[in-house]
Swiss-Prot record:
This is E3 ubiquitin-protein ligase ZNRF4. Residues 28-250 are lumenal. GO terms for molecular function: ubiquitin protein ligase activity; zinc ion binding. One of its GO terms (cellular component) is endoplasmic reticulum membrane. PANTHER family: OS02G0798600 PROTEIN (PTHR47168:SF1), RING ZINC FINGER DOMAIN SUPERFAMILY PROTEIN-RELATED (PTHR47168). SMART domains: RING (SM00184). Residues 152-223 form the PA domain. Interacts with CANX. It is a single-pass type I membrane protein. It comes from Macaca fascicularis (Crab-eating macaque). It is found in: Endoplasmic reticulum membrane. Pathway: Protein modification; protein ubiquitination. A zinc finger (RING-type) spans 309-352. PROSITE patterns: ZF_RING_2.
Length: 429
Protein backbone atom coordinates (compact mmCIF):
# COMPACT_ATOMS: atom_id res chain seq x y z
CA UNK A 1 0.00 0.00 0.00
CA UNK A 2 1.11 3.61 -0.51
CA UNK A 3 2.54 5.45 2.46
CA UNK A 4 2.77 9.25 2.82
CA UNK A 5 6.34 10.31 3.33
CA UNK A 6 8.06 13.71 3.07
CA UNK A 7 10.05 14.30 -0.07
CA UNK A 8 13.79 14.96 0.40
CA UNK A 9 14.79 18.59 0.04
CA UNK A 10 16.10 19.48 -3.40
CA UNK A 11 17.03 22.73 -5.15
CA UNK A 12 13.96 24.69 -6.15
CA UNK A 13 13.58 25.68 -9.77
CA UNK A 14 10.32 25.37 -11.66
CA UNK A 15 7.52 23.40 -10.10
CA UNK A 16 5.06 20.79 -11.22
CA UNK A 17 1.44 21.15 -10.19
CA UNK A 18 -0.90 18.16 -10.16
CA UNK A 19 -4.66 18.33 -9.69
CA UNK A 20 -6.50 15.04 -9.05
CA UNK A 21 -10.17 14.29 -8.44
CA UNK A 22 -10.81 10.74 -7.20
CA UNK A 23 -13.92 8.91 -5.99
CA UNK A 24 -14.12 7.35 -2.56
CA UNK A 25 -13.86 3.72 -3.73
CA UNK A 26 -10.59 3.17 -5.51
CA UNK A 27 -9.06 -0.23 -5.79
CA UNK A 28 -5.51 -1.28 -6.31
CA UNK A 29 -3.98 -0.08 -9.53
CA UNK A 30 -4.36 -3.03 -11.88
CA UNK A 31 -1.13 -2.48 -13.71
CA UNK A 32 2.12 -3.34 -11.98
CA UNK A 33 4.47 -0.33 -11.85
CA UNK A 34 8.15 -1.02 -12.42
CA UNK A 35 10.03 -1.38 -9.19
CA UNK A 36 13.55 -0.17 -8.52
CA UNK A 37 16.19 -1.98 -6.52
CA UNK A 38 16.59 -0.74 -3.02
CA UNK A 39 13.22 1.00 -2.89
CA UNK A 40 10.52 -1.64 -2.37
CA UNK A 41 10.06 -5.39 -2.91
CA UNK A 42 9.26 -6.41 -6.45
CA UNK A 43 5.62 -6.97 -7.24
CA UNK A 44 4.27 -4.96 -4.30
CA UNK A 45 1.12 -3.18 -5.47
CA UNK A 46 0.47 0.48 -4.89
CA UNK A 47 -2.85 1.97 -3.85
CA UNK A 48 -4.31 5.37 -4.42
CA UNK A 49 -3.86 7.73 -1.45
CA UNK A 50 -6.91 7.98 0.81
CA UNK A 51 -8.13 11.10 2.56
CA UNK A 52 -6.33 10.46 5.88
CA UNK A 53 -3.12 10.03 3.92
CA UNK A 54 -3.06 13.21 1.89
CA UNK A 55 0.18 14.35 0.33
CA UNK A 56 2.11 16.77 2.45
CA UNK A 57 3.07 20.21 1.16
CA UNK A 58 6.62 18.94 0.75
CA UNK A 59 5.67 16.22 -1.67
CA UNK A 60 5.02 12.50 -1.97
CA UNK A 61 7.98 10.18 -1.93
CA UNK A 62 7.52 6.47 -2.44
CA UNK A 63 11.23 5.83 -2.11
CA UNK A 64 11.62 6.86 1.54
CA UNK A 65 12.15 4.20 4.24
CA UNK A 66 8.98 3.00 5.93
CA UNK A 67 10.28 3.74 9.41
CA UNK A 68 10.05 7.46 8.77
CA UNK A 69 6.24 7.17 8.57
CA UNK A 70 5.88 5.92 12.14
CA UNK A 71 3.70 8.29 14.09
CA UNK A 72 4.33 9.05 17.74
CA UNK A 73 4.69 11.79 20.29
CA UNK A 74 7.73 13.97 19.49
CA UNK A 75 10.43 14.46 22.00
CA UNK A 76 10.55 17.82 23.83
CA UNK A 77 13.81 18.76 22.13
CA UNK A 78 12.44 17.93 18.70
CA UNK A 79 9.25 19.85 19.40
CA UNK A 80 11.25 22.93 20.41
CA UNK A 81 13.33 22.71 17.25
CA UNK A 82 10.17 22.31 15.17
CA UNK A 83 8.57 25.38 16.77
CA UNK A 84 11.70 27.45 16.10
CA UNK A 85 11.81 26.24 12.50
CA UNK A 86 8.15 27.16 11.98
CA UNK A 87 8.74 30.62 13.42
CA UNK A 88 11.71 31.18 11.12
CA UNK A 89 9.83 29.88 8.09
CA UNK A 90 6.83 32.05 8.89
CA UNK A 91 9.09 35.09 8.70
CA UNK A 92 11.21 34.07 5.74
CA UNK A 93 8.46 32.41 3.77
CA UNK A 94 7.60 34.08 0.48
CA UNK A 95 4.25 33.33 -1.14
CA UNK A 96 4.73 30.65 -3.80
CA UNK A 97 2.79 30.71 -7.06
CA UNK A 98 3.81 27.23 -8.27
CA UNK A 99 1.84 24.57 -6.41
CA UNK A 100 0.61 21.03 -6.93
CA UNK A 101 -2.99 20.47 -6.04
CA UNK A 102 -4.27 16.95 -5.40
CA UNK A 103 -8.05 16.80 -4.94
CA UNK A 104 -9.06 13.71 -2.95
CA UNK A 105 -12.52 13.13 -1.47
CA UNK A 106 -13.46 16.80 -1.65
CA UNK A 107 -10.32 17.75 0.31
CA UNK A 108 -7.88 20.04 -1.41
CA UNK A 109 -4.17 19.56 -1.03
CA UNK A 110 -1.11 20.84 -2.87
CA UNK A 111 2.29 19.30 -3.40
CA UNK A 112 5.44 20.89 -4.89
CA UNK A 113 7.86 18.83 -6.93
CA UNK A 114 11.29 20.35 -7.37
CA UNK A 115 12.65 20.44 -10.91
CA UNK A 116 15.16 22.21 -13.12
CA UNK A 117 14.30 23.72 -16.50
CA UNK A 118 16.25 22.69 -19.56
CA UNK A 119 18.89 24.95 -21.04
CA UNK A 120 17.37 24.61 -24.49
CA UNK A 121 13.94 25.05 -25.98
CA UNK A 122 11.48 27.78 -25.10
CA UNK A 123 11.11 28.90 -21.49
CA UNK A 124 7.96 28.28 -19.53
CA UNK A 125 5.31 30.97 -19.75
CA UNK A 126 4.61 32.96 -16.58
CA UNK A 127 1.13 31.43 -16.35
CA UNK A 128 2.60 27.94 -16.82
CA UNK A 129 1.56 25.00 -19.00
CA UNK A 130 -1.34 22.78 -18.01
CA UNK A 131 -1.92 19.34 -19.47
CA UNK A 132 -2.45 15.65 -18.93
CA UNK A 133 0.68 13.74 -17.99
CA UNK A 134 1.31 10.65 -20.13
CA UNK A 135 4.21 8.21 -20.25
CA UNK A 136 5.72 7.91 -23.68
CA UNK A 137 6.42 4.68 -25.56
CA UNK A 138 9.27 3.88 -25.70
CA UNK A 139 9.91 5.19 -22.18
CA UNK A 140 13.32 6.71 -23.00
CA UNK A 141 12.00 8.54 -26.11
CA UNK A 142 15.21 7.83 -27.98
CA UNK A 143 13.12 6.82 -31.00
CA UNK A 144 9.91 8.26 -32.40
CA UNK A 145 7.17 7.91 -29.78
CA UNK A 146 3.47 7.25 -30.07
CA UNK A 147 1.16 10.22 -30.30
CA UNK A 148 -0.93 10.99 -27.20
CA UNK A 149 -4.54 9.82 -27.18
CA UNK A 150 -6.49 12.74 -25.79
CA UNK A 151 -9.93 12.06 -27.18
CA UNK A 152 -12.30 14.93 -26.34
CA UNK A 153 -10.12 16.38 -23.59
CA UNK A 154 -9.68 20.12 -23.57
CA UNK A 155 -6.06 20.15 -22.38
CA UNK A 156 -2.94 19.07 -24.18
CA UNK A 157 -0.52 16.29 -23.24
CA UNK A 158 2.74 16.49 -21.31
CA UNK A 159 5.26 13.70 -21.83
CA UNK A 160 6.95 11.81 -18.98
CA UNK A 161 10.31 10.54 -20.26
CA UNK A 162 12.98 8.37 -18.64
CA UNK A 163 16.61 9.49 -18.56
CA UNK A 164 19.64 7.86 -20.27
CA UNK A 165 20.16 5.95 -23.54
CA UNK A 166 20.35 9.18 -25.63
CA UNK A 167 20.71 12.94 -25.41
CA UNK A 168 18.17 15.22 -23.78
CA UNK A 169 17.58 17.30 -26.88
CA UNK A 170 16.70 14.18 -28.91
CA UNK A 171 14.20 13.00 -26.27
CA UNK A 172 12.41 16.35 -26.17
CA UNK A 173 12.41 16.66 -29.95
CA UNK A 174 10.79 13.21 -30.35
CA UNK A 175 8.11 14.18 -27.82
CA UNK A 176 7.48 17.42 -29.70
CA UNK A 177 7.14 15.60 -33.02
CA UNK A 178 4.61 13.22 -31.44
CA UNK A 179 2.38 16.14 -30.42
CA UNK A 180 3.25 16.75 -26.75
CA UNK A 181 3.17 20.35 -25.54
CA UNK A 182 5.88 19.88 -22.87
CA UNK A 183 8.21 17.21 -21.57
CA UNK A 184 9.22 16.04 -18.09
CA UNK A 185 12.44 14.01 -17.97
CA UNK A 186 12.97 12.08 -14.73
CA UNK A 187 16.13 10.65 -13.20
CA UNK A 188 16.75 6.93 -12.67
CA UNK A 189 17.86 5.48 -9.31
CA UNK A 190 18.49 8.99 -8.03
CA UNK A 191 16.64 12.09 -6.95
CA UNK A 192 19.43 14.44 -7.98
CA UNK A 193 18.50 17.24 -10.34
CA UNK A 194 20.67 17.96 -13.35
CA UNK A 195 20.58 20.73 -15.91
CA UNK A 196 19.63 19.39 -19.31
CA UNK A 197 21.86 20.70 -22.09
CA UNK A 198 21.80 20.15 -25.82
CA UNK A 199 24.42 18.40 -27.89
CA UNK A 200 23.39 19.21 -31.43
CA UNK A 201 22.78 22.77 -32.54
CA UNK A 202 20.56 21.44 -35.32
CA UNK A 203 18.29 19.66 -32.85
CA UNK A 204 18.32 22.63 -30.52
CA UNK A 205 17.02 24.90 -33.26
CA UNK A 206 14.08 22.57 -33.90
CA UNK A 207 12.87 22.31 -30.30
CA UNK A 208 9.91 24.60 -29.62
CA UNK A 209 8.44 23.15 -26.40
CA UNK A 210 9.61 23.61 -22.80
CA UNK A 211 11.05 20.77 -20.74
CA UNK A 212 12.05 20.19 -17.12
CA UNK A 213 14.02 17.60 -15.16
CA UNK A 214 12.75 15.91 -11.96
CA UNK A 215 13.99 13.19 -9.62
CA UNK A 216 12.90 9.56 -9.63
CA UNK A 217 10.77 9.91 -6.49
CA UNK A 218 8.78 12.72 -8.07
CA UNK A 219 8.18 10.62 -11.19
CA UNK A 220 6.91 7.68 -9.15
CA UNK A 221 4.53 9.93 -7.22
CA UNK A 222 3.26 11.35 -10.48
CA UNK A 223 2.66 7.83 -11.79
CA UNK A 224 0.63 6.99 -8.68
CA UNK A 225 -1.56 10.04 -9.19
CA UNK A 226 -2.01 9.24 -12.87
CA UNK A 227 -2.94 5.65 -12.05
CA UNK A 228 -5.58 6.78 -9.59
CA UNK A 229 -7.38 8.98 -12.08
CA UNK A 230 -6.88 9.18 -15.80
CA UNK A 231 -8.26 12.71 -15.77
CA UNK A 232 -5.49 14.02 -13.51
CA UNK A 233 -3.47 16.81 -15.01
CA UNK A 234 -0.20 18.56 -14.22
CA UNK A 235 0.79 22.19 -14.23
CA UNK A 236 4.31 23.32 -15.10
CA UNK A 237 5.19 26.70 -13.66
CA UNK A 238 8.45 28.62 -13.99
CA UNK A 239 10.51 29.94 -11.13
CA UNK A 240 8.68 32.37 -8.91
CA UNK A 241 9.07 35.74 -10.61
CA UNK A 242 10.76 38.34 -8.47
CA UNK A 243 8.11 40.16 -6.54
CA UNK A 244 8.64 43.89 -6.67
CA UNK A 245 6.04 44.57 -4.03
CA UNK A 246 7.41 45.03 -0.53
CA UNK A 247 4.54 42.94 0.88
CA UNK A 248 6.01 39.84 -0.76
CA UNK A 249 9.09 40.08 1.45
CA UNK A 250 8.09 40.04 5.13
CA UNK A 251 11.68 40.42 6.29
CA UNK A 252 12.14 43.60 4.28
CA UNK A 253 8.78 44.90 5.46
CA UNK A 254 9.65 44.35 9.12
CA UNK A 255 13.14 45.78 8.60
CA UNK A 256 11.72 48.87 6.91
CA UNK A 257 9.24 49.44 9.75
CA UNK A 258 11.88 48.93 12.43
CA UNK A 259 14.32 51.17 10.58
CA UNK A 260 11.81 54.01 10.34
CA UNK A 261 10.91 53.65 14.02
CA UNK A 262 14.55 53.60 15.04
CA UNK A 263 15.34 56.63 12.90
CA UNK A 264 12.41 58.54 14.44
CA UNK A 265 13.52 57.67 17.98
CA UNK A 266 17.16 58.56 17.31
CA UNK A 267 16.26 61.88 15.68
CA UNK A 268 13.94 62.76 18.58
CA UNK A 269 16.63 61.96 21.14
CA UNK A 270 19.16 63.99 19.16
CA UNK A 271 16.88 67.04 19.06
CA UNK A 272 16.12 66.75 22.78
CA UNK A 273 19.83 66.43 23.55
CA UNK A 274 20.63 69.56 21.53
CA UNK A 275 17.86 71.49 23.29
CA UNK A 276 19.15 70.35 26.68
CA UNK A 277 22.70 71.43 25.84
CA UNK A 278 21.42 74.79 24.58
CA UNK A 279 19.44 75.36 27.79
CA UNK A 280 22.47 74.41 29.91
CA UNK A 281 24.66 76.81 27.94
CA UNK A 282 22.16 79.65 28.42
CA UNK A 283 21.96 79.05 32.17
CA UNK A 284 25.74 78.87 32.48
CA UNK A 285 26.13 82.13 30.53
CA UNK A 286 23.62 83.89 32.75
CA UNK A 287 25.35 82.69 35.90
CA UNK A 288 28.70 83.81 34.51
CA UNK A 289 27.40 87.28 33.63
CA UNK A 290 25.81 87.64 37.06
CA UNK A 291 29.00 86.54 38.80
CA UNK A 292 31.19 88.89 36.78
CA UNK A 293 28.81 91.78 37.45
CA UNK A 294 28.87 91.09 41.16
CA UNK A 295 32.65 90.90 41.10
CA UNK A 296 32.90 94.22 39.33
CA UNK A 297 30.38 95.90 41.67
CA UNK A 298 32.41 95.42 44.83
CA UNK A 299 31.08 97.03 48.01
CA UNK A 300 33.36 99.41 49.89
CA UNK A 301 32.70 100.56 53.44
CA UNK A 302 32.91 104.33 53.92
CA UNK A 303 34.83 105.53 57.01
CA UNK A 304 34.96 109.04 58.38
CA UNK A 305 38.73 108.90 58.91
CA UNK A 306 39.31 109.07 55.18
CA UNK A 307 37.00 111.96 54.38
CA UNK A 308 39.50 114.80 54.91
CA UNK A 309 43.04 115.67 53.89
CA UNK A 310 45.65 115.27 56.66
CA UNK A 311 47.59 118.28 55.35
CA UNK A 312 44.95 120.97 54.88
CA UNK A 313 42.30 119.37 57.10
CA UNK A 314 39.67 120.10 54.45
CA UNK A 315 37.03 117.55 53.61
CA UNK A 316 37.11 115.94 50.23
CA UNK A 317 34.54 117.28 47.87
CA UNK A 318 33.30 116.10 44.51
CA UNK A 319 35.76 117.01 41.80
CA UNK A 320 38.82 117.23 44.09
CA UNK A 321 42.02 115.71 42.79
CA UNK A 322 43.33 113.22 45.33
CA UNK A 323 46.53 111.27 45.56
CA UNK A 324 46.76 107.95 47.41
CA UNK A 325 50.24 106.95 48.52
CA UNK A 326 51.42 103.30 48.62
CA UNK A 327 50.72 103.36 52.35
CA UNK A 328 47.01 104.01 51.52
CA UNK A 329 47.03 107.57 52.93
CA UNK A 330 45.09 110.03 50.81
CA UNK A 331 45.84 113.72 50.26
CA UNK A 332 44.82 116.52 48.00
CA UNK A 333 47.10 116.77 45.02
CA UNK A 334 47.59 120.46 45.70
CA UNK A 335 48.61 119.59 49.25
CA UNK A 336 50.95 116.65 48.74
CA UNK A 337 52.72 117.79 45.59
CA UNK A 338 54.50 120.73 47.28
CA UNK A 339 55.48 118.38 50.10
CA UNK A 340 57.20 116.01 47.73
CA UNK A 341 58.87 118.80 45.80
CA UNK A 342 60.42 120.41 48.92
CA UNK A 343 61.12 117.51 51.28
CA UNK A 344 64.63 115.97 51.18
CA UNK A 345 63.07 112.53 51.58
CA UNK A 346 59.98 111.72 49.66
CA UNK A 347 57.87 110.04 52.29
CA UNK A 348 54.32 110.09 53.59
CA UNK A 349 53.72 113.09 55.89
CA UNK A 350 51.82 110.85 58.33
CA UNK A 351 53.66 107.53 58.52
CA UNK A 352 57.01 108.57 56.99
CA UNK A 353 56.94 105.59 54.61
CA UNK A 354 59.23 106.23 51.68
CA UNK A 355 57.56 106.80 48.35
CA UNK A 356 60.70 107.54 46.33
CA UNK A 357 60.26 104.42 44.17
CA UNK A 358 56.90 105.61 42.95
CA UNK A 359 57.65 109.26 42.47
CA UNK A 360 58.36 108.82 38.77
CA UNK A 361 54.96 107.33 38.28
CA UNK A 362 53.45 110.24 40.18
CA UNK A 363 55.06 112.66 37.80
CA UNK A 364 54.11 110.75 34.69
CA UNK A 365 50.31 110.85 34.89
CA UNK A 366 47.69 113.15 36.31
CA UNK A 367 44.02 112.37 36.05
CA UNK A 368 40.84 114.02 37.18
CA UNK A 369 37.84 112.62 38.98
CA UNK A 370 35.55 115.21 37.48
CA UNK A 371 34.69 112.89 34.58
CA UNK A 372 33.91 109.98 36.86
CA UNK A 373 31.14 109.47 39.30
CA UNK A 374 32.64 108.37 42.65
CA UNK A 375 29.19 107.43 43.87
CA UNK A 376 29.01 104.52 41.45
CA UNK A 377 29.25 101.11 43.12
CA UNK A 378 32.74 99.71 42.90
CA UNK A 379 34.28 102.98 41.71
CA UNK A 380 37.91 103.10 42.74
CA UNK A 381 40.34 105.38 40.87
CA UNK A 382 43.86 104.05 40.46
CA UNK A 383 46.37 104.91 43.17
CA UNK A 384 48.88 106.45 40.80
CA UNK A 385 46.24 108.88 39.51
CA UNK A 386 45.31 110.05 43.01
CA UNK A 387 48.94 110.37 44.03
CA UNK A 388 49.71 112.48 40.98
CA UNK A 389 46.90 114.91 41.79
CA UNK A 390 48.10 115.66 45.34
CA UNK A 391 51.33 117.22 44.18
CA UNK A 392 50.09 120.49 42.72
CA UNK A 393 48.71 121.85 45.97
CA UNK A 394 51.78 121.73 48.23
CA UNK A 395 53.18 125.18 47.39
CA UNK A 396 49.73 126.69 47.59
CA UNK A 397 49.17 125.32 51.09
CA UNK A 398 52.57 126.41 52.29
CA UNK A 399 51.95 129.88 50.92
CA UNK A 400 48.62 130.03 52.67
CA UNK A 401 50.23 128.98 55.99
CA UNK A 402 52.82 131.85 55.88
CA UNK A 403 51.43 134.51 53.55
CA UNK A 404 53.92 137.21 54.71
CA UNK A 405 57.05 135.12 54.42
CA UNK A 406 59.10 134.55 51.34
CA UNK A 407 59.62 130.80 51.23
CA UNK A 408 62.87 129.86 49.68
CA UNK A 409 63.83 126.43 48.61
CA UNK A 410 66.16 126.01 51.58
CA UNK A 411 63.58 127.05 54.15
CA UNK A 412 61.01 124.79 52.57
CA UNK A 413 63.35 121.85 52.72
CA UNK A 414 64.16 122.60 56.38
CA UNK A 415 60.48 122.80 57.12
CA UNK A 416 59.80 119.50 55.45
CA UNK A 417 62.27 117.78 57.75
CA UNK A 418 60.41 119.00 60.85
CA UNK A 419 56.98 117.74 59.79
CA UNK A 420 55.54 115.32 62.24
CA UNK A 421 53.03 112.54 61.52
CA UNK A 422 50.29 114.97 62.58
CA UNK A 423 48.95 117.53 60.09
CA UNK A 424 51.07 120.75 60.01
CA UNK A 425 49.78 123.77 61.96
CA UNK A 426 49.92 127.46 61.09
CA UNK A 427 53.05 129.34 62.27
CA UNK A 428 51.09 131.74 64.40
CA UNK A 429 49.60 128.97 66.57
Amino acid sequence: MLRCRPEPLMPRATRVAVAVSLPLSHAVIPTQLPSHPGHRPSGRPRRCPKAPCLPSPVGLSSTQPAKRVTMGWPRPGQALVAVKALLVLSVLQVPAQAVVRAMLEDISSSVDFADLPALFGVPLAPEGIRGYLMEVKPANACHPVEAPRLGNRSLGAIALIRRYDCTFDLKVLNAQRAGFEAAIVHNVHSDDLVSMTHVSEDLRGQIAIPSVFVGEAASQDLRVILGCDKSAHVLLLPDDPPCRDLDCHPVLTVSWALGRTLALVVSTLFVLNRLWLWAQACCSHRRLVKTSTCQKAQVRTFTRRNDLCAICLDEYEEGDQLKILPCSHTYHCKCIDPWFSQAPRRSCPVCKQSVAGTEDSFDSTTDSFSDEDPSLPGHRPPIWAIQARLRSRRLELLGRASPHCHCSTTSLEAEDTTVSPAPPEAPGQ
